[in-house]
Amino acid sequence: SSKRIMKTICICGGGALGLVVASVLSHTREVAVRVLTAHPQQWSKSIEAVDNTGKVYQGVLEKVSDRAEDIIPQSDIVLLCLPGFLIEQSLRQIAPYVTNQAVGSIVSSTGFFFQAHRILGGSASLFGFQRVPYVARVREYGHSADLLGYKQQLYMATENLSDDFEAKWVEWLQTPVAHLSNYLEASLSNSNPLLHPARLYGMWHDWKGETYKDQTLFYAQWDELSSEVYIAMDEEFQKLCCKVGVKIPSVLDYY
């Protein structure tokens, strides 16, 4: 049988999620993993993620660098594991070196597809997960992280990629990956992008400018007003989804 050509994946971003994904992927020995990070000197070539049953994903990185030109041209797939506010600058950093690589984001609800269309162009090969595959927390930066939770099912949108692209991720992440019909289904979210502002409004809408004695707990002290605002925001969101022809479960269905 013909020898399988190993894919090279570049992870952009060195936080908890980047480290966990890099550990899981390199642990499979199915892919070569490299990391583009602002702090390469703080990274070990040997990394690990530990889940809450004690299972350890140990991996060895092929390369760690802060220079896109040293790491992007030889990569087949580029995966951004970054908070939303860093995605645009990261896309601009890698853009000069992107030829036909697949470029994606570990979560798409912060505007990845909109920014990638603008910066990489309409013919770029793009993919994005709807939600993150893991809950992650750093143990030691650049060395180890805790994998605190798995998702049973992942959803991905792709553009200009072959039909078997999701199947590769099923193999690498050992999790089912379903195909979304277009990028808006991955980009429009009534999860955190609505949940957080609704709760913040509930906490601060009547603030008088004084310093509080105690911290308000975000979830543990959740109140009726935050729920009412969240549900009202979702109703407006559902009207938008209906207009653009996108189906996303309502908050009341989902939670």
Task: Give the location of each predicted region.
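Short acidic low-complexity segments
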Residues: 60-74
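A conserved active-site cap/scaffold subdomain adjacent to cofactor or substrate pockets
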Residues: 205-238
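Nucleotide donor/acceptor-binding cores
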Residues: 7, 101, 152-154
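Rossmann-like NAD(P)(H) cofactor-binding subdomain of soluble oxidoreductases
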Residues: 77-80, 84-142
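Rossmann-fold dinucleotide-binding core
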Residues: 116-214
